[in-house]
Amino acid sequence: MPTTAAFLRALYILTTLRGIGTSHEVRNIKHGSESSASRARFLLHTLVIIAAKYLVLDMMTFQPPSPEDTDRMFGEGKEYLLFRPDGLPPPKMQDILTNLGVTLLGWGPIGSWFIEVHYRILSVASVGLGISQPHQWPPLFGSITEAHTLRRFWANFWHQLFRWPMQGLSSFLCRDVLRLPRPSLAERYLKITLVFAISSCLHLAIDGRAGIMLPRSGALRCFLLQPVGIILEDGAQALYRRLRGDAPLSKWTRAVGYIWTWAFLSLVAPMYNFPLFRYQDPARNGVPVPVLRPAMEYFRVKG
């Protein structure tokens, strides 16, 4: 391989966090129409998606809640539906619905679209400039219908941008430093815990840039509880298989899985999101460049 080609190949491996098109490609990536699309078709298709999702995000966030509404819905301790701080009354139905709504939107389409739009903008720039090819930009997120367990939420639906480096570091610590037997339950669950611990530190650093430091940030609480949910889930699934065997999952079993997944996330996700609503500048919760507000003001002046 010529020196220039080898250098570009090495550079690509260093910059493709998901290992796209390499032997290290992370699992569960769905390759869609971009695999066979021409550059022009890919750019047009991606630009349409960016525009549509950007406008929806702008519409959902251009009118932030007032300080009074923020305190009423996301006030100190409101993120806890269980084990509430002393002085807070038991959660009401409105609290439960707020937690569920924030989770379904923030960890469903709205949260994923915020990340996806940036990813697609980068793909347009890279493919448009000839730096990469369309097939190197598969969808960042999977289908939300895959998330009928916590494992599948993180492995099949949510983005895998940092899975490769995080798993590499956790595997090194478990196998080479701690020398845990492989396979074993200790190695399996410590690896998962370390991955979420690294993720929590990354989110804590992001919060810090927004001025939300410990103990205000809920990153550690939210992400370090994910392995607990996965362990409980694995135990329940093992018991189910022992009782029912390896029969294919029925639609009712999947329905129970969806309820479990989103119920658990509704208990822990607000631990991360509510402090952002409380302490972060509301302008940071919207799109980088608002479109709807200036348009409405323009037509209001014209009217």
Curated annotation (Swiss-Prot):
Major location category of this protein: membrane
Question: Where in or outside the cell?
Answer: Membrane
Gene null: resulting phenotype: Impairs the production of acetylaranotin and accumulates chemically stable intermediates or shunt products such as bisdethiobis(methylthio)-deacetylapoaranotin and bisdethiobis(methylthio)-deactylaranotin. Also leads to the accumulation of deacetylhaematocin and demethyl-deacetylhaematocin when ataS and ataY are also deleted.
The free-text function statement in the UniProt record for this protein reads: Acetyltransferase; part of the gene cluster that mediates the biosynthesis of acetylaranotin, a member of the epipolythiodioxopiperazine (ETP) class of toxins characterized by a disulfide-bridged cyclic dipeptide. The first step of acetylaranotin biosynthesis is performed by the NRPS ataP which produces diketopiperazine cyclo-L-Phe-L-Phe via the condensation of 2 phenylalanines (L-Phe). The ataC domain of ataTC then catalyzes the formation of bishydroxylation of cyclo-L-Phe-L-Phe.
Name the source's superkingdom: Eukaryota
The EC class name is: transferase
The family note in this entry says: Belongs to the wax synthase family.
PANTHER family xrefs:
LONG-CHAIN-ALCOHOL O-FATTY-ACYLTRANSFERASE 3-RELATED (PTHR31595), WAX SYNTHASE DOMAIN-CONTAINING PROTEIN-RELATED (PTHR31595:SF27)
Instruction: State the name under which the record lists this protein.
Output: Acetyltransferase ataH
What kind of membrane protein is this, topologically? Multi-pass membrane protein
Q: What is the lineage of its organism?
A: Eukaryota, Fungi, Dikarya, Ascomycota, Pezizomycotina
Record GO cellular component, one term: membrane
Q: Does the keyword Signal apply?
A: yes
Q: Which GO terms describe its biological process?
A: lipid metabolic process
Q: Which organism is it from?
A: Aspergillus terreus (strain NIH 2624 / FGSC A1156)
Keywords annotated in UniProt = Acyltransferase, Membrane, Signal, Transferase, Transmembrane, Transmembrane helix
What pathway, per the record?
Mycotoxin biosynthesis
Q: Which residues form the signal peptide?
A: 1-23
Q: InterPro entries from the xrefs?
A: Wax_synthase, Wax_synthase_dom
- Transmembrane ranges, per UniProt, are 42-62, 194-214, 257-277
EC number(s) per entry: 2.3.1.-
- Can you provide one Gene Ontology molecular function annotated for this UniProt record? O-acyltransferase activity
